[in-house]
Amino acid sequence: MAEDSHMQKQLEFQNGSLEEGFVVRSLENEPQNMMESLSPRKYSSSLKFKANGDYSGSYLTLSQPVSAKRSPSPMGTSVRSSPSLAKIQGSKQFCDGIDKNISMKPPISFLSSAASLGGYPLGKADLDHYTGRDSERSTRLSEKPPYSRYSSRNKSHDSVYFLGGLEGRKTSGSLLTMWNGNSLSCTGSSPISRSGAASMPSSPKQVRKMNLQDHSTLQPRLSRHKEPASENVSVRTRKYSGSSLSNMGAYSRSLPRLYKATDNQMSPLSLPPRSSLGNSRRGQLGEKDLPHSLVDSDNYLNFSSLSSGASPYKTCLSEGNPYVSSALSVPASPRVARKMLLASTSSDDFDRASYSGTSPSHSFISGEPDRVLVARRNFSCGSMELDDSDLESLRQSSETPQPVLRERKSSISSISGRDDLMDYHRRQREERLREQEMERLERQRLETILSLCAEYTKPEGRRLSAGTTVADVQKINKELEKLQLSDEESVFEDALVCPDARYRCHRKGSLQDVDVAGFGNLGHSASFLAPRGSRSDELLGDLTRTPPSSSAAFLKATNESSYLSILPKTPEDIGEEQRTQELAAMEDARMVILNNLEELEQKIKDINDQMDESSRELDMECALLDGEQKSETAELMKEKEILDHLNRKITELEKNIVGEKTKEKVKLDAEREKLERLQELYSEQKTQLDNCPESMREQLQQQLKRDADLLDVESKHFEDLEFQQLEHESRLDEEKENLTQQLLREVAEYQRNIVARKEKISALKKQASHIVQQAQREQDHFVKEKNNLIMMLQREKENLCNLEKKYSSLTGGKGFPINPNTLKEGYISVNEINESCGNSTNLSPSTQFPADADAAVTEPALAVPVSQPQSSEHFRSLEERKKQHKEGLYLSDTLPRKKTTPSLSPHFSSATMGRSTTPKAHLPLGQSNSCGSVLPHSLATMTKDSESRRMLRGYNHQQMSEGQRQKPEFYSRTASESNVYLNSFHYPDRSYKDQAYDTLSLDSSDSMETSISACSPDNISSASTSNIARIEEMERLLKQAHAEKTRLLESREREMEAKKRALEEEKRRREILEKRLQEETSQRQKLIEKEVKIREKQRAQARPLTRYLPVRKEDFDLRSHVETAGHNIDTCFHVSITEKTCRGYLIKMGGKIKTWKKRWFVFDRNKRTFSYYADKHEAKLKGVIYFQAIEEVYYDHLKNANKSPNPLLTFSVKTHDRIYYMVAPSPEAMRIWMDVIVTGAEGYTHFLL
C-alpha cells in the first residue's frame, strides 16, 4: 500500500508538469487542433455499423498514449487523457523510470501503426513510451490466468475480447484485440487459445442478473490476488485501455470490427479521444472498491477487461500493442443504440451459463452489482451537462454508500402506454433536433474561425471580410448559447420527471481542485453523452483552464472561445459588415426572384403550349369522329335504299302473280262462255228435232250428232284448260311464297343493320359531345392555372420592385450589379447533396452547399469545396443499386429548380445563419397546386442542358485540393460498405452520409426523407433530391405508362367490337334456330292436326273394300299385282291388263247431265292418268283423271248413284273435284278395276297414318 501511495503521488506530480506544458503549447495549436479533432467526429455516424472489411485508409487507429493517475484498484487503473501531444511527450521520463522496475520482464514487439493525436504523428519518444507500457502490461498479464468467453456468433460480429482472472482457467486471449493486437501463444503457454466477443443481454434485467453472477464469481479472486496486484502493477498512460471499456460483455456485441493498419499507412485517421466519467471516479477508489472493469461508466458502449490487474498465472503474451484503440462511437440516435442493445439474444445466456458453470465456487458479494448500471441510467437523456450539484456529488462520492439495485426507469422498456411512448418520442426528437442544430452552428463557427486564420496569411488589401467573419462568429455563439441553455433545461426537466436518474455515479470519487485537468479528460471520454460528440470536447477542454463555478459560467466559457480574440472588433466595422451582409442578402433574394420569374414565365409558356396542344387534339378527335359518323351515315343510306328496293320487289312480285292469275281467269271465262253457247245450241237443236217434220228429222239428227260431238270436244278442252289454269295458279303461289320469304329475310337483315348503324351514330355523337365537354373542362383548368401563375408572377415582380427600391435606398441610388453567372440553371441532385455532405457529414439538409460556384466573385478564403468526380460516380452507382428502396420516396421530387451562386457564400453569412435565403411569399414552384399538371409536359425539356451542367460542375471539381478530395472518397467507401450491415437488418439504406441523423422517425411519415422533400416554403433550393438520371427514368416511365394506357384502350375497344360481333352472330343464330323451330313446330302441328282429324272425323262411309294402298314405284308390275291379289285375268275378257296399262269398257254417269254412257277407259301408269274415250280406238278423248286427283276408290254401298243401270256392279272413284260413278260389266271386272285404280290413287292420303 505504501508503494501504491508513492506511485500515485509521483503520477500526480507528473500530470501537473504536463498540464503546464500543455497550456504553453495550446495557444499555438488550438485552431488546427480543433479542426483536426472535429474531422474525426465526422466518422461517428458513418462508422457505427461498419461491416467486416479490410482496406487502406482505415479509420480506427486510436492509439493515443497519455499520462494518468494510477488507481489503487487491484485489477484496473484509472484513465486520464490529454488533448495535446505535449503531455504524451512529457510523460516519457516518468515511463522510463517505471521501465527500470520491470526490466526483468521480457520485452514485447511493437507492431501497431503509429498513433496520432489530432493529426500529429508520434516520434521516437512515443514509441519508447509505448514499449515501456507494453512491457509493464505483459508483466501483469503473466501473473494471472486470462479468461475469454467463446461464442461463434460473437466472433462473427465483433473483434472485441477481454481477459478474466479466474483460477484454474487454462485459456488465453488477447486483451481487447480490436486493431493492433493479435493473440499469439508464447513459449510455455497452453496449447488451447480461446477468444470471443462479449455478448449483450437482451434486457436490463438480464444485465443485472449476469452482473450478479460475475460479482459472485470474481469476488474471491479479488481478495486472493490483491497483494500481487499491488506489487506488480505499473502505471498505465493508455487512454483507451480496457478500463475505459467496462462491461463490454454485458452491453453490446454489435460493435464495428477493428483491424490492423496496413504497412503503407503511416498516419491513419483517428477518432476523437474519449474517456469516461467512471474513469475519473475510479481514480479515487480504494482497495475495498470493486474493480473498475465491472463498474460501467456512463454509456451503452463502455466495456471493460477483467485482466487489468495482476495474476500469478502467465499463459500468453499479446503480440504488438496489447492496448485498445477504441472505435466505439456513439450511436447516431437512441433508436440505433436500442437496436445495438437488442442485437444480442441468446448468446449471452450461453456464455453466462458456461462462465458460471466453470468455477461455481467463486462468487461476488451480492451487494456489489448495483454499481454497474447507475451511471448509465443517469445519462439516458442523451447529453451530459455538469452543474454545481454534479461537481459536489463527484467530490463526495467516495463517502456516499452505493444505491440498492432498482428497476430501470426513464427508458423505452418501461413505457407501457401509447401516450407515454409518443411523449417520450417527442422529447427525444426535440432534443436531437437541438443537438443537430448546435452541431451545425458549431461547425459553422469553426469553419469561420479557420477562414479567419487564413485571412491573416493574406496581404492587407485582401482582408475585407474579416469583420464580417467576426460578426458571423458572434451570432453563431449567441445561437449556440441559446440552444445550450434550452438543452440544459430539457436535461433538468427529464431529471425532475425521473428523480432516480439524478442519483449518479459521480459520488464514487472526490473531485478536488487539483483534479480539474483530470475532469477535463473525463469530459473527452463522456463526449458521446453530449449532442453527438460535437460540443463536449470544447466544453470540457475549456474546463481544463477554467474551473466551473456555475452552469452559466460553464456555458459562457464554452461559447466564448479564445479563438474569437484574434481580430479586434469595432462598432464601425460591425455596422459596415451588417450593411454589406444586407446588400448581399438582397442580391441573393433578387437572384432567387429572377429565377422564380423565369420559372413562372416558362410554366406559363408550357401551359399555353398545353392549351394549344389540347385544342389541336380536340380538333383532330372531332374530325375523326365526324368522318366516322359520315361514313356510317352513308352506309345507312345505302342500306335504306336496298331495303326500299326489296320492298318494291316484293310488291312487284305480288302484282305479277295477280296479273297472271287474271289472264288465266279471263281465258278460262272465254272458254266457258263458248262451251255454254254450244250447249244452248245443242239444246235448241234437240228441241227442234222433236218438233221438226219427219223429212227433216234425219238431217237434224246428223246435225245434232255433229253438235254433240263438238260439244263434247269443247267441254273436254274447257276442262283441260281449267285444270291447267289451276295448276298454273298453284305454281305461281308456290313461287311467290318462296321469293317473298327470301326477300323478307333480306329485309329483316337490312333492318337490323340499319338499327345498329343508327345506334353507332348516336354513340359517336355522344362521344363527340363528351370530348368537347372534357376539352372545355381542361381548358378551364388550364386557364385557372395560368391565372394563378400570372398572379404569382405579378407578386414576384412586385417583390422585385420593392427589393430594388430598398437596395437603391441603401446604396444611394445604385442599382443591382449585373452578374450573368448567377443566373445559371441547374438541378440539385442527390449526388450534389452527397458531395456537400462529404465535407460536413452532420450538416442538416438546409445547409447544403451549392454545386456551382462563381470563382471570379467568391472569395478564395470562403469558397466551399465540393466532392471529387470519383465520389460522385460512386454515389450515382450507389443510388442505382438502391433504387428499389427509394423509388417510392422520391417520385414527387423531380421538378427542376434554379440554383443561385452568390458572391459570398450564404451558408456562413450572419444574415442567413447557414439557411437558404428563399423568400416565403409563396410556396415553391415545384409544390404549387397549379403546377401539378405541368410535370409530364416539362419532363421532355429537362435533359437539354444536362451536359452543360455536368461540364460546369466539372470545372468546379478542378478547384479542390488533394486533401479535400480524400475525405469524401473515404466517406463513400465506409458508407458503401456499411450497406451490407444495413441490408441484413432490412433497413432502407440512408448511407449515413446524406443527412445528419434521422431524428424524425417514429413512423415513415415523419422521417427525414419526407421532411427534406418539397413540404416547406424554404426548401426550394434543397427539396429536390433527384438527378438527371432519375428525371430521364421518370420520363421513360411516363412514356411507358402512356403507351400502356393507349394499348389498353385499343385492346378494350377491340374487345368491345369482338363482343358486339359475337352478340350479333349469336342473335342471328338464335333467329335462325327460332325460325327452324317454328317450322318444325308448324309441321308437327300439321301432323297432329291430321291425326286428330282422322280420329275426330265423322266418317260417312267405312273404309273402302280395297286391300292395297297406292303404289308409286316405277318398276311396278300391274298385271302381276292383280294376279297376286287373286284375280283370274284370263277368264275375264272384259278387262285387258298389261304391266303398265289396263283397258276396258265401263258405263259412266255424266257430270252435269246425269246420263249413263258407255266409255272406253284406259289406266296408264306411264302417263299417270286415268282417261276415257268414246270408243276403243282411243281417237276421241272424253276426259282425263290424274293420279294425283284420285283420292278414294270404293264400292257404292250407299246406292248414291242416280238411276244406275246395275247398282250391284256400281263403284265410285273420288277425286278433288267430283265423284265418278261407274258400272262394270261383271263383278269380277268391278273388283279388278277397283284394285287397279287404287294403285294410282296418289291423292289417297286420309288413311296414310
Swiss-Prot record:
Please note every region of biased composition (Polar residues).
74-84, 231-248, 901-919
InterPro entries tied to this protein = PH-like_dom_sf (IPR011993), PH-like_domain (IPR052212), PH_domain (IPR001849), PHLDB1/2/3_PH (IPR037810)
Coiled-coil spans are 580-692, 718-803, 1028-1094
Q: Where is the PH domain?
A: 1139-1242
Region span, Disordered: 64-85, 128-154, 190-248, 264-289, 388-424, 866-934
- Keyword terms: Cell junction, Cell projection, Coiled coil, Cytoplasm, Membrane, Phosphoprotein
Top-level lineage group:
Eukaryota
Q: How does it sit in the membrane?
A: Peripheral membrane protein
- Modified sites of kind Phosphothreonine: 546, 570, 894
Q: Which residues carry this modification: Phosphoserine?
A: 71, 73, 156, 203, 241, 244, 329, 333, 347, 380, 383, 389, 411, 416, 465, 486, 510
Here the segments flagged for biased composition (Basic and acidic residues) are 128-143, 873-888
Q: Where does tissue-level expression of this protein occur? A: Expressed at postsynaptic membranes of skeletal neuromuscular junctions (at protein level).
Q: Which GO terms describe its biological process?
A: basement membrane organization; cell migration; establishment of cell polarity; establishment of protein localization; microtubule cytoskeleton organization; negative regulation of focal adhesion assembly; negative regulation of stress fiber assembly; negative regulation of wound healing, spreading of epidermal cells
A single GO CC term for this protein reads:
intermediate filament cytoskeleton
Ranges of Low complexity composition bias in the record = 267-283
Cite the PANTHER family for this sequence.
PLECKSTRIN HOMOLOGY-LIKE DOMAIN FAMILY B MEMBER 2, PLECKSTRIN HOMOLOGY-LIKE DOMAIN, FAMILY B, MEMBER 3
What does the UniProt record say this protein does? Seems to be involved in the assembly of the postsynaptic apparatus. May play a role in acetyl-choline receptor (AChR) aggregation in the postsynaptic membrane.
Q: How does it assemble?
A: Interacts with FLNC. Interacts with AMOTL2; interaction may facilitate PHLDB2 localization to the myotube podosome cortex that surrounds the core. Part of a cortical microtubule stabilization complex (CMSC) composed of KANK1, PPFIA1, PPFIBP1, ERC1/ELKS, PHLDB2/LL5beta, CLASPs, KIF21A and possibly additional interactors; within CMSCs KANK1 and PHLDB2/LL5beta appear to be the core components for targeting of microtubule-binding proteins KIF21A and CLASPs, whereas PPFIA1, PPFIBP1 and ERC1/ELKS serve as scaffolds for protein clustering.
Record remark: domains: The PH domain mediates the binding to phosphoinositides.
Q: What protein is this chain from?
A: Pleckstrin homology-like domain family B member 2
